[in-house]
C-alpha cells in the first residue's frame, strides 16, 4: 500500500490524515496517510528516511521553508511562495516540491461564490501564509490588491517581489479606510483571540466578503467583527480541504469531491 503522511511539530492536531482517508475512500485509492512528528533539529534526515518508502507528504509548520530547500525540483508556484507544503517522490527518486495553499484559498473562495476578477482585495499580513496565496489571487486579475501589515515595510517587500504579477500596493493597518470587496485575513491573530486594528469603514454591508485563513468551532474574532458590520464571512476550513485535494490530485492523478469532506469536518467541529 502506498504510504503518505504529514510532517509537522506539533502534529497531533492535524486534520490532514482524516481528510486524506476520506479522499481515498471516496476515490477508491489504496493508500495509508499518517501524522509524522518530525524533530525540530533534523527535519531533512527525518524526511529523507520517510521517502525511502513514502510516495508523498504534506508539510506544515514549522518545516515549509526547510522542505522548500530540500526539494530537488520546484513547481513555479512553490518557487514564488518560497515554501513547500507538498512533496512528491518522482519516478527517478527525486523530490518535487509544490505549494497548494494559494490554490486551496482561491478554490474555496470560488466555491463560496466570490468573484475575484475586477475586485478590490485587501490581504492582511505579510508572512508565509500571505506570500503563498499572492500569485493565485493575482492570476484572477483583481482591480487592486493591497497588502497590509503592522510593519508596513514587510508588506512593501512583498509588493516589490510580486509587482510584475498585478496591481499591488502596500499599507500599514492604520492607513486603511477605503471600502473593499474582499478582505482575507492571513495573520495568525485569530489563534490568540485577537483582531488586527481595522477601520469599520473597510466593510460595505451586504457587499464585502471577509475570509479568515484560520478556523475554529466558534466564529473567529475577525469573522465576528466582519459579520457585525454586515459582511458575509467564511473561515479557513474549506481552504484546508481544498489545498489537500490539490495535493491528492498531484499524488494520485484523481480529483476528489471536496464538498462532502468539508461538510463532515464542519459537522465534527460542531
UniProtKB/Swiss-Prot annotation:
Positions annotated to bind shikimate: 14-16, 60, 85, 101, 215
GO molecular function: NADP binding; shikimate 3-dehydrogenase (NADP+) activity
Enzyme Commission designation: 1.1.1.25
Pathway this chain belongs to: Metabolic intermediate biosynthesis; chorismate biosynthesis; chorismate from D-erythrose 4-phosphate and phosphoenolpyruvate: step 4/7
A Gene Ontology biological process term: shikimate metabolic process
InterPro entries: Aminoacid_DH-like_N_sf, NAD(P)-bd_dom_sf, SDH_C, Shikimate_DH, Shikimate_DH-bd_N, Shikimate_DH_fam, Shikm_DH/Glu-tRNA_Rdtase
UniProt catalytic activity: shikimate + NADP(+) = 3-dehydroshikimate + NADPH + H(+)
Gene3D superfamilies: Leucine Dehydrogenase, chain A, domain 1, NAD(P)-binding Rossmann-like Domain
GO cellular component entries: cytosol
Annotated residues for binding of NADP(+): 76, 125-129, 149-154, 213, 236
Keyword Oxidoreductase belongs to the record: yes
Top EC class for this record: oxidoreductase
Keywords annotated in UniProt: Amino-acid biosynthesis, Aromatic amino acid biosynthesis, NADP, Oxidoreductase
Active site: 64 (proton acceptor)
Family per similarity comment: Belongs to the shikimate dehydrogenase family.
Function: Involved in the biosynthesis of the chorismate, which leads to the biosynthesis of aromatic amino acids. Catalyzes the reversible NADPH linked reduction of 3-dehydroshikimate (DHSA) to yield shikimate (SA).
PANTHER family named among the record's database cross-references: BIFUNCTIONAL 3-DEHYDROQUINATE DEHYDRATASE_SHIKIMATE DEHYDROGENASE, CHLOROPLASTIC, SHIKIMATE DEHYDROGENASE
Subunit-structure text: Homodimer.
UniProt-recorded name of the protein: Shikimate dehydrogenase (NADP(+))
Annotated organism of origin: Stutzerimonas stutzeri (strain A1501) (Pseudomonas stutzeri)
Gene name tied to this protein: aroE
Amino acid at each position: 500500500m502506498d504510504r503518505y503522511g504529514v510532517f509537522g511539530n506539533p502534529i497531533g492536531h492535524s486534520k490532514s490524515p482524516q481528510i486524506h482517508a476520506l479522499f481515498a475512500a471516496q476515490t477508491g485509492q489504496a493508500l495509508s496517510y499518517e501524522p509524522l512528528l518530525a524533530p525540530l533539529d533534523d527535519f531533512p534526515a527525518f524526511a529523507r528516511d520517510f521517502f525511502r518508502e513514502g510516495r508523498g507528504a504534506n508539510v506544515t509548520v514549522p518545516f515549509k521553508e526547510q522542505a522548500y530547500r530540500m526539494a530537488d525540483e520546484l513547481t513555479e508556484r512553490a518557487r514564488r511562495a518560497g515554501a513547500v507544503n507538498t512533496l512528491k517522490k518522482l519516478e527517478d527518486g527525486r523530490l518535487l516540491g509544490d505549494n497548494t495553499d494559494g490554490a486551496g484559498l482561491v478554490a474555496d473562495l470560488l466555491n463560496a461564490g466570490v468573484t475575484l476578477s475586477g475586485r478590490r482585495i485587501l490581504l492582511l499580513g505579510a508572512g508565509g501564509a500571505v506570500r503563498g496565496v499572492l500569485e493565485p489571487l493575482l492570476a484572477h486579475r483583481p482591480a487592486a490588491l493591497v497588502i497590509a501589515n503592522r510593519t508596513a515595510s514587510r508588506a512593501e517587500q512583498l509588493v516589490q517581489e510580486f509587482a510584475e504579477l498585478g496591481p499591488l500596493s502596500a499599507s500599514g493597518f492604520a492607513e486603511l479606510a477605503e471600502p473593499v470587496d474582499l478582505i482575507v485575513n492571513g495573520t495568525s491573530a485569530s489563534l490568540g483571540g485577537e483582531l488586527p486594528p481595522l477601520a469599520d469603514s473597510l466593510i460595505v454591508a451586504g457587499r464585502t466578503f471577509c475570509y479568515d485563513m484560520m478556523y475554529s468551532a466558534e466564529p473567529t474574532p475577525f469573522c465576528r467583527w466582519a459579520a457585525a458590520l454586515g459582511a458575509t464571512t467564511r473561515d479557513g476550513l474549506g481552504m484546508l480541504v481544498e489545498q489537500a485535494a490539490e495535493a491528492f490530485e498531484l499524488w494520485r492523478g484523481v480529483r476528489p469531491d471536496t464538498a462532502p469532506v468539508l461538510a463532515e469536518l464542519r459537522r465534527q467541529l460542531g
